């Protein structure tokens, strides 16, 4: 895991799952299990927009924070289906996920648009979680470093790295059950830190994170948290992840 000077962020991305009623039930089951979680980490949940208010109410009095799965770069306007940073702030949101591989793929989101979303987030006082990662084809062609460096450099233009989280999510590992080897995940996270040039940058790993591999991942020197998809949909599973314990020192090499 990172040195204690780097904030640790454990985030669950629900994607298009959970109604308001389900979010409320989730919180009731989840909160007792993380009530005594170590204070060296931030626990974050990213529900669908429709469940943000309900979940915020259900989490009242706890340290669990809310993230948005998207944010537009304009304050207001004729942008059907979008939501502004100001609107999210009013709901008590603290983080925004930008650049996830799914909107990159399904909506052809560009690095420039992702950068605009990240900049709008920071300007409003939200912390963007910038997702970067390579496809299986790019990985097989030894393009991992080139692709991710481009995403980092273009996505972070004009961004303050002290108010930022970067999530390395190899696309080939998202929702596939395939997990990037912890040593390789750590290597890429270290490269990202060097490219950004900010030693205290919080860098997450994402891609088939589950209770069975969280301890090993968090023992790595350049991994400062995780962005969890499917395993965050079950409160018991995500609570185990949020309550991770450090693996043996040997695994941290």
Curated annotation (Swiss-Prot):
- Pathways involved: Carbohydrate biosynthesis; gluconeogenesis; Carbohydrate degradation; glycolysis; D-glyceraldehyde 3-phosphate from glycerone phosphate: step 1/1
Classification via InterPro entries: Aldolase_TIM, TIM_sf, TrioseP_Isoase_bac/euk, Triosephosphate_isomerase, Triosephosphate_isomerase_AS
PROSITE patterns for the chain = TIM_1, TIM_2
Residues bound to substrate: 13-15, 175, 208, 229-230
Principal location: cytoplasm
List the SUPFAM superfamilies hit by this protein, alphabetically.
Answer: Triosephosphate isomerase (TIM) (SSF51351)
Cite the entry's keywords alphabetically: Cytoplasm, Gluconeogenesis, Glycolysis, Isomerase
Show the Pfam families listed in the entry.
Answer: TIM (PF00121)
Output the Gene Ontology cellular-component terms. Answer: cytosol
CDD domains the record matches: TIM
Which molecular function GO terms apply here? triose-phosphate isomerase activity
- UniProt KW Isomerase keyword: yes
- Catalytic reactions of this protein: D-glyceraldehyde 3-phosphate = dihydroxyacetone phosphate
Could you describe the subunit structure of this protein? Homodimer.
Q: Which family does it belong to?
A: Belongs to the triosephosphate isomerase family.
Which HAMAP family does the UniProt entry name for this protein? TIM_B
What is the protein's name according to its record?
Triosephosphate isomerase
- What taxonomic ancestry is recorded? Bacteria, Bacillati, Cyanobacteriota, Cyanophyceae, Synechococcales
Instruction: List the gene name.
Output: tpiA
